[in-house]
């Protein structure tokens, strides 16, 4: 017998469905459900008197015969490929299926089997995203990893050895011995980790040995000398061993100008860090490289978005991070040359146009490791307020939302050759997922799933009679401990290191997998962020133009996802 529910009652019971709109946190961004994979009247839901019971929504089918390990019911997926309502089945730590869950003996169109071996996680009224990927990590302290995963990051790529002066300034894990020790340390964390070697060398031998040791890429940094010769050598080695190169270019233009650096690229794929330039790079016009087809450009979060405080805080941060002396006039001039309101304002707009493809942190080296996701959505909000809806976003902000979520999920995964494992909510990938209450979206995840197991979660007083009494905050869960963290996380290495059995020699307990497919990439591979405008920068005024149009915007005086959510 049919039963009719109001749209509001349905959303409150099973979550939003096609046509419903959801506000993201306290921003001016709204997303609209595009498709619903569940079946009206045949939804599954767990609880007393609910559907997932034996003989109803739960079948007697064993896990060995096809039932999943975990089902997330009625969640709203937000990913670069769509905004859809679905059940999500997880099996053996991977996403098994996005579709309709239930008991195939009594329900139609079931492609996710719930059985006696299936755990249930209520996704009704929740937003599900892929775990974030931060590709600009200075591994200065291990506590960064706790902060990152608590914010929704599940993969970290960068370099360092701890609070050494070199690591404070550059994202490099230099040399085999340091690489081995960091790979061994990676076993201690419920986080996918990959390390970049130092790429600054005019001869290849010192670069090759780092790749053999496990480096998944090489980092060129001006503090080690990013000259045209080192750029060419580094990219040549990367091409041979299929690893990515990340670059922080020559702020002082000592070894050449931006045109010389572009020439040294020789149309080879490269990930340009903080491409606007406040984080470092040819002053004042490094931003030009985002119009090059072989350049995969990212921002770091100190300049995201442009606010009334952005310029003031940058000078002190820069002096500390790059070991500069405020008593030396040349050091102060070096710092001031990198901080330009005009290029930072243009960066906002270039993100909105899809010309900048990624956002990362620059952790403790001017950036905040726990704010990649917040800063991304604050930028999106600011652009919605200042520039209006994107073409095609009439009733909701779906295109803009998909463009911005791609900046910290699929695009960094593609760039660093790990998209076959992580970076999106798609079948076959590691189940690194974040569940968000819409009111807290992008700010504080409700649950972080790592390799199919809950690793971190909002949790109340452990001595309380129920899980919810205050103080409720992010805490590590069972997936973060002992063998579980090793079974649910990956360590990324080079194919050359796998062939030399480096993980076995080091006794690594995590699964080690190789990066691949990094050298033939172009900007066109960046999902929803593949624009190639012709960029011009006035050397006197620093004004930025894209295809002849002046790019400028006002700094924000207030932002969402800020004080409303935090006491400190």
Swiss-Prot record:
Record flagged with keyword Cytoplasm: yes
GO process terms (BP): urea catabolic process
**EC number(s) stated in the UniProt entry for this protein:** 3.5.1.5
Q: Which GO terms describe its cellular component?
A: cytoplasm
How cofactor binds (record note)? Binds 2 nickel ions per subunit.
**Matches recorded under InterPro entries:** Amidohydro-rel, Metal-dep_hydrolase_composite, Metal_Hydrolase, Urease_alpha_N_dom, Urease_alpha_subunit, Urease_AS, Urease_asu, Urease_asu_c
According to the UniProt entry, its GO molecular function terms are: nickel cation binding; urease activity
Question: Which residues are involved in binding substrate?
Answer: 221
Q: In what pathway does it function? A: Nitrogen metabolism; urea degradation; CO(2) and NH(3) from urea (urease route): step 1/1
The keyword Ion transport is annotated on this UniProt entry: no
- Ranges in a coiled coil: none
Reactions mediated catalytically: urea + 2 H2O + H(+) = hydrogencarbonate + 2 NH4(+)
Where in or outside the cell it occurs: the entry states: Cytoplasm
Q: Which residues form the active site?
A: 322
Cofactor(s) for this protein?
Answer: Ni cation
Under Pfam families, the record lists: Amidohydro_1 (PF01979), Urease_alpha (PF00449)
List residues of the Urease domain.
Answer: 131-568
Where on this chain does Ni(2+) 1 bind? 136, 138, 219, 362
Q: Which residues does this entry mark as bearing N6-carboxylysine?
A: 219
Q: Where does Ni(2+) 2 bind?
A: 219, 248, 274
The subunit structure is: Heterotrimer of UreA (gamma), UreB (beta) and UreC (alpha) subunits. Three heterotrimers associate to form the active enzyme.
Q: Which PANTHER family match?
A: UREASE (PTHR43440:SF1)
What's the family?
Answer: Belongs to the metallo-dependent hydrolases superfamily. Urease alpha subunit family.
**UniProt protein name:** Urease subunit alpha
- Origin organism is Nostoc sp. (strain PCC 7120 / SAG 25.82 / UTEX 2576)
Q: What does UniProt list as this organism's lineage? A: Bacteria, Bacillati, Cyanobacteriota, Cyanophyceae, Nostocales
